[in-house]
């Protein structure tokens, strides 16, 4: 969950390395008052493959692996247009229902792909 790691009590992180993506884009649907992402999606083409990371939709950031697989096969917005994510565990509040957040994940992912092709 949030603020948890797999580190043991006597361990410490000494470095974090992120591969430089070949191309990437981040799109968010902001809350109109705070500008925080109701849903945000990063799509990146890295040396080890396509990565799709989602924030705001669930209790913590997660990878949308079904989208990653689809984009590996065809890197176009159309390749993920018909995909739906299981939104049963998504956040739900006065700003967006879980189902709407699921819809926003797809929309923001398609916009991110379109921005980098």
What are these regions (language model features)?
Residues 1-117:
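C-terminal structural segment of proteins
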């Amino acid at each position: 969950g949030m603020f948890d790691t797999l580190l043991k009590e006597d361990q410490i992180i000494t470095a974090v390395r992120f591969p430089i993506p070949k191309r990437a884009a981040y799109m968010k649907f902001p809350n109109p008052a705070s500008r925080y992402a109701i849903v945000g999606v990063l799509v990146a083409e890295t040396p080890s493959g396509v990565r799709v990371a989602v924030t705001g939709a669930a209790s913590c950031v997660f990878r949308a692996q079904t989208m990653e697989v689809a984009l590996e096969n065809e890197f176009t917005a159309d390749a993920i247009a018909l995909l739906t994510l299981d939104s049963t565990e998504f956040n739900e509040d006065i700003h967006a229902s879980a189902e709407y957040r699921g819809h926003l994940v797809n929309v923001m992912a398609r916009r991110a792909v379109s921005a980098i092709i």
